[in-house]
A protein has these predicted regions:
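Short, flexible loop/turn elements at secondary-structure junctions
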Residues: 164, 168, 280-284, 379
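Helical lid/core segments from catalytic subdomains that handle acyl or acyl-like groups
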Residues: 295-381
Length: 454
């Protein structure tokens, strides 16, 4: 019998594996809302076929001795477990599935390190802003929807919860798997839409951006909760208006919104002004069936000086242009996913257990220089996620990223059907659900302030 193929952990996977903590599992969650129902047997078959079409996802951590030099992925021909499950329907089914996505990471020892839960006819989720209003036209007046009870949800709706162990995979790769499953299930073309083309801009003049060597601001502590782990709040907003020909993108508007939201929050909580640094994942992979499956994003850090964050309405156009120049320059840089230092840390010259201890120690020592927060903007969902006539096409898609300390807060956005889907995820050691709701309100306010003429 041929032994399974083994692949050494890439740098991102190894660093993540070194720093795992039971209290705050490294999970990514994707939540897809469909207007209709799915046939259970057909969905299981379609998802299994999608896994086979992207065989790199069929992997588990290979066992190894104490003095091994590497962690390795072991590729399998079939899943070790049934990936698709159907929780008991009920009023709390949506809330419970979201909770499981935050507290139960799929094990690395079983192939594949993901799970798909299918919640049928779920009622409103308590403790979350993912109401049953997703995909409907907004009511008149900003913020009105939030304070009104959700209407009765059709018993035919379905929510797909894909939970991913982030040590092995990232959200965009697993969204590709879902798109393939949708195409197999529904027989509809789920090819990605072409990425928007941006006009080539002349190189921006050098600017006096804050140094990455200065300690950035931390998100001020709110009202921490006693239980460990992450909290999550999701909401649906209107996409910010951006005049045609603007020199900035929606991503730049979201970056400015995130910076202003945290600056406002910190000021409310008595923190002195400090530079902010916001980590931004950049993904250059193709979105078609050739997309490499794994952790494929590289991380860049967008700095903001305290003076930039004390702006008036007249300053917003210049602030957006400056942010656009900054993000464009950072995206154009060629660099390793986690920087050059991570490559040295993961060089297999010593036993992996020794490198793990060193990595954890360096992470603790570098905590004061860790970026303030992470903004992951998936952008417009590139696939229709159309499961056919009965189940229909996705009308809302949320992602959330891990929010371990010292950051303690991540912001994830995506757009579907002309709406912006925002997820705020936080460490319970830093914030409570009430704090998350206030940050959501601040985000909505500052997003509106970015709607200006160029």
């Amino acid at each position: 019998m041929t032994p399974p193929t083994r692949i050494p952990f890439p740098v991102v996977d190894e660093v993540s594996r070194h720093c795992l903590q039971e209290e705050e599992p490294e999970t990514v969650h994707i939540e897809v809302h469909l207007p209709g129902r799915l046939d259970r047997s057909r969905l299981r078959k379609a998802f299994l076929e999608a896994l086979h079409r992207h065989p790199r996802i069929l992997m588990r951590e290979a066992p190894g001795g104490r003095y091994r030099r590497r962690y390795e992925w072991e590729l399998t021909t079939e899943p070790d477990v049934e990936v698709v499950s159907f929780p008991e329907p009920g009023r709390d089914a949506l809330r419970d599935a979201r909770t499981r996505a935050l507290v139960e990471a799929p094990p690395l020892s079983l192939s594949p390190p993901i799970r798909l839960e299918v919640v049928e006819g779920a009622g409103p989720a308590e403790g979350s802003e993912a109401t049953d209003l997703v995909g409907l036209h907004p009511l008149k007046g900003r913020g009105e929807r939030r304070d009104q009870p959700p209407p009765g949800r059709s018993q035919n709706t379905t929510v797909l919860f894909l939970t991913i162990n982030h040590t092995a995979l990232d959200g965009p790769a697993c969204l590709r798997i879902l798109a393939t499953a949708a195409e197999i299930y529904g027989g509809k073309d789920n090819s990605p839409t072409p990425a928007p083309t941006r006009p080539q801009e002349p190189p921006a003049p050098p600017e006096n951006a804050p140094s990455n060597w200065s300690r950035p601001a931390r998100v001020a502590q709110g009202t921490p909760e006693n239980s460990p782990g992450n909290g999550l709040l999701v909401t649906e907003l209107a996409l910010p208006h951006r005049p045609k020909g603007s020199p900035y993108t929606v991503n730049d508007q979201l970056m400015v919104t995130t910076a202003l939201t945290i600056a406002h929050w910190n000021k409310e909580h008595g923190q002195p002004p400090r530079p902010l640094r916001i980590t931004m994942p950049v993904d250059d992979r193709p979105r078609d069936t050739t997309m490499p499956i794994g952790n494929g994003t590289r991380l860049v850090e967008v700095p903001f000086a305290p003076d930039e964050l004390r702006h008036g309405p007249d300053d917003m156009p210049a602030f957006l242009r400056r942010t656009a120049q900054r993000t464009r320059a950072l995206k154009s840089l060629t660099r390793p996913q986690l920087g050059h230092g991570a490559g040295l840390l993961t060089a297999p010259v010593t036993p992996v257990a020794w490198r793990a201890a060193l990595t954890r120690g360096l992470r603790r020592a570098a905590a004061p220089w860790t970026s303030t927060t992470l903004l992951s903007n998936i952008g417009r969902i590139p696939y229709p996620l159309d499961f056919g006539e009965e189940a229909g096409r996705a009308h809302a898609v949320w992602f959330s990223a891990p929010a371990r300390m010292p950051r303690g807060l991540t912001v994830t956005t995506a757009s579907t059907a002309g709406r912006l889907h925002l997820a705020l995820r936080w460490s319970r050691a830093l914030l409570s659900h009430g704090d998350g709701a206030h940050l959501r309100d601040l985000f909505e306010h500052y997003l509106h302030t970015t709607e200006v003429a160029p």
